[in-house]
């Protein structure tokens, strides 16, 4: 469960990075 949350946060950060760029 925690692993999934960490993965989601990682994807969210990547998506945010791409959006900011």
From Swiss-Prot:
Keywords: Amidation, Secreted, Toxin. The modification Serine amide is found at residue 21. This is Cupiennin-6c. It comes from Cupiennius salei (American wandering spider). Signal peptide: none annotated. It is found in: Secreted. It comes from the Eukaryota. GO terms for cellular component: extracellular region. Belongs to the cationic peptide 04 (cupiennin) family. 09 subfamily. One of its GO terms (molecular function) is toxin activity. Expressed by the venom gland. Its main location: secreted.
């Amino acid at each position: 469960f925690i692993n999934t949350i960490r993965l989601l946060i990682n994807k969210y950060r990547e998506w945010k990075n791409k959006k900011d760029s």
